[in-house]
Amino acid sequence: MAYPSTHPAEAADSSVVDLTGSSCPRLTAPSELGRRLAALDDRYIREQFVPLDDLAADWPGGPAAVRADIAAGRLPQPAYRLDDGTDMVPGDYLVPVAVAGSVAALHGWFVREFREAAERVDVPHDPETIEIEWQDYLGGGYFVCLRHATPATMAEKTRHIVDLNQLIADPHPADQVWCKRLRLGVEGLAAIERPFAILDPARWGTPMSGQWYGTFLRALYPAAFAE
């Protein structure tokens, strides 16, 4: 089995040569590699997210009010922070507040929406589980992984991951039905997830779900994705 690609070619310096004069990107110096990875990471974040203060400029009370609500645990934390200290959030960061009606109503809205979505996709939705999901939402991590971090997509992600874990716990790669279920699960998860920033695994200390349940599974079971 060939190893899957986890980094773009530009992450290393193609102009580096070994002692024979042959091209050898793997000899890229650590500092240059770090610079390149940081540049790719920064570019992705700026393309996918917007500065919190810019988004909150026209919000009642402006950025100061939004930051106060974040600090008080009433609104989610940012997705990323840039080198200059700029906090970055998705463009639809404040949409749930508008839908809920107010910051004060956001928690109640989240509980109702998650319960309904979880019932539809058959994942746990007891009060304790919903509170854990709410705290995870406030942590801002779902902005990193989901294209639109809503209670519905959070429940949907859980469903896909539960299904995929069950499939890989008892693999049957020669079974067409198993392969189809694996493919649908991987593709369904990919449809709601962001591509992820190149340094996210270092931030989180683990492979990202898009790698674990996407890149790695596609490499491990290529026949399931041959169609």
Can you say where each PLM-predicted feature lies in the sequence?
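Polyanion-binding surface elements
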Residues: Y44-V66
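Long, charge-rich, low-complexity intrinsically disordered regions
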Residues: A2-S31, L37, P78-E227
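Charge-enriched amphipathic alpha-helical scaffolds
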Residues: D58, G62-R81
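Short, amphipathic alpha-helical "recognition" segments used to contact nucleic acids or chromatin
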Residues: R35-E47
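A broad "ordered helical/assembly scaffold" signature
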Residues: D42-I45, L52-D54, A71, Y80, ...
